[in-house]
């Protein structure tokens, strides 16, 4: 059975672990536990063929900047996550996350993933952002960044309501299996 390695990166507390737990168990975790490094595996059927989707969670906190790239070798696709209600996490996509993964894995495809979309219409979240003269990130703004950074595409979801959640992983699988170049040369290799 072919394995697809999918590594999830992004700032701390944008919902990377919730995304993975909600997708793999259909349950939303009730408390925040910062991640050091976790992985999950699910079997998915694509075109009648079974694949193992290996999902690798990473810690977004700066303390792990030197440790995190150890999970990058052999990655088939990255999910670069930001919260649609955290402008700083969106900014870090281009300032930190895409430079980091493209430095280590220049040929590996990545998707830009907006998380926590259920909070985009939440009055108290909107009010908090407004106090700092900020507002939620719109899909159009994120799609433009995805194009500018040469992401495969922009997708968004809510791990809480599961809206768009399955689509994130379906698109990740498609990106990993897309054959623009021979498969072997697209996997991440640390030299």
From Swiss-Prot:
Lipidation positions, renumbered (S-geranylgeranyl cysteine): 188
Main location: membrane
Cysteine methyl ester PTM positions: 188
Binding sites annotated in the UniProt record for GTP: 10-17, 57-61, 115-118
Assembly description: Interacts with CDC42EP1, CDC42EP2, CDC42EP3, CDC42EP4, CDC42EP5, CDC42SE1, CDC42SE2, PARD6A, PARD6B and PARD6G (in a GTP-dependent manner). Interacts with activated CSPG4 and with BAIAP2. Interacts with DOCK11/Zizimin2; the interaction activates CDC42 by exchanging GDP for GTP. Interacts with DOCK9; the interaction activates CDC42 by exchanging GDP for GTP. Interacts with DOCK8 (via DHR-2 domain); the interaction activates CDC42 by exchanging GDP for GTP. Interacts with IQGAP1. Interacts with NET1 and ARHGAP33/TCGAP. Part of a complex with PARD3, PARD6A or PARD6B and PRKCI or PRKCZ.
Record PTM Phosphotyrosine, positions in chain: 64
GO CC annotation: centrosome; cytoplasm; lamellipodium membrane; membrane; midbody; mitotic spindle; spindle midzone
Species of provenance: Macaca fascicularis (Crab-eating macaque)
Motif window: Effector region: 32-40
Protein name as it appears in the record: Cell division control protein 42 homolog
InterPro entries: Cdc42 (IPR037874), P-loop_NTPase (IPR027417), Small_GTP-bd (IPR005225), Small_GTPase (IPR001806), Small_GTPase_Rho (IPR003578)
Gene Ontology BP term (one): phagocytosis, engulfment
Regulation of activity: Regulated by guanine nucleotide exchange factors (GEFs) which promote the exchange of bound GDP for free GTP, GTPase activating proteins (GAPs) which increase the GTP hydrolysis activity, and GDP dissociation inhibitors which inhibit the dissociation of the nucleotide from the GTPase.
Domain of life: Eukaryota
PANTHER family referenced in this protein's UniProt entry, alphabetically: RHO FAMILY GTPASE
